[in-house]
Amino acid sequence: MFARPAIRACQSLKQPVRRYTNTPPPQSGNANNSRVGILIASAVGMAGFGTYFMFGQGTTPAAGVKALGAEPKKALEMEKGFVSLQLDDVEVVNHNTKRLRFKLPEDDMVSGLHVASALLTKFKPEGAEKPVLRPYTPISDEDQKGYLDLIVKKYEGGPMSTHIHELVPGQKLDFKGPLPKYEWSANKHPHVAMIAGGTGITPMYQIMRAIFKNPADKTKVTLVVGNITEEDILLKKQLAELENTYPQRFRAFYVLDNPPKDWAGTKGYITKDLLKTVLPEPKEENIKVFVCGPPGMMKAISGNKVSPKDQGEVSGILKELGYKQDQIYKF
């Protein structure tokens, strides 16, 4: 079976919980006990599926299999250092999130990122001694030529997200990359689970895109993603298309803290009971669980990372459910 029987709509949770809505995201690439619900914040400034909806008319997704021939030129390579890219277009996604398209130096260039990897942004505020650095995972395909797309949530008092939101087409931002994350290859795991909060969906999206655009990759994916309101759900159209196209291989479960009256999904918080119901069991062979979200969510679900290169110990709900260190990756 694809997974244990899953219940799409759960009853609203009644127990009190500690809220994480306004907790800023961890600055890295991308709950107190088992019965505490976790409110998922609707954003993570970080640490990528296809480009089913782009700006304006829409853009054809990059080819699923690279054509034979010379490797395309890469805009970003670590040895190049920071590269200034010009903002080409901006789309307002919701009240605090924008989608931004940056032109690569040449039309036939690709970004240079791979799956899974992120990039680093840099700018120096006026009067500051040091520049601000923040990682983001693009949502455009790694094979896409000519541009890269970011989804960025604006945080109150967040210097980088505020700066990016204030950019207008024609202005530039410095980028460096790729920042390696989890090295993905086709069929590396037969079943992966993804737990995301807000824009923590971006590194998950990057891996999902690689899986489902590759005909040779048969990996199954279970996604649990939490947000505050329905308008905060990012890439929902693409995720719905995936469910319709691959019903035996992809399932998405949405959790809203403040759902509309007609909401048919899960209401409230991501809980131990929900994850126990929908995720692959820890005893399944060679599974992987990816987690990406704000610090409060990470602490409650899996435990936080110690640093970009140190995953830290596994704790929280996933440990209580029996998942081991080597089964979990934190973005």
UniProtKB/Swiss-Prot annotation:
GO cellular component, one term: mitochondrial outer membrane
Source species: Pyricularia oryzae (strain 70-15 / ATCC MYA-4617 / FGSC 8958) (Rice blast fungus)
Domain FAD-binding FR-type: 80-185
Membrane topology: Single-pass membrane protein
Primary location recorded for the protein, binned into one broad class: mitochondrion
EC number in record: 1.6.2.2
GO molecular function: cytochrome-b5 reductase activity, acting on NAD(P)H
UniProt record, GO biological process: ergosterol biosynthetic process
Family, per entry: Belongs to the flavoprotein pyridine nucleotide cytochrome reductase family.
Tree of life domain: Eukaryota
UniProt keyword Cell inner membrane, yes or no: no
The protein, known as: NADH-cytochrome b5 reductase 2
Gene: MCR1
Ranges that cross the membrane: 36-56
Matches recorded under Pfam families: FAD_binding_6, NAD_binding_1
Reaction catalyzed: 2 Fe(III)-[cytochrome b5] + NADH = 2 Fe(II)-[cytochrome b5] + NAD(+) + H(+)
Binding site for FAD: 188-223
Swiss-Prot/TrEMBL cofactor(s): FAD
InterPro entries according to UniProt: CBR-like, Cbr1-like_FAD-bd_dom, FAD-bd_FR_type, Flavoprot_Pyr_Nucl_cyt_Rdtase, FNR_nucleotide-bd, OxRdtase_FAD/NAD-bd, Riboflavin_synthase-like_b-brl
Record keywords: FAD, Flavoprotein, Membrane, Mitochondrion, Mitochondrion outer membrane, NAD, Oxidoreductase, Transmembrane, Transmembrane helix
UniProt subcellular location: Mitochondrion outer membrane
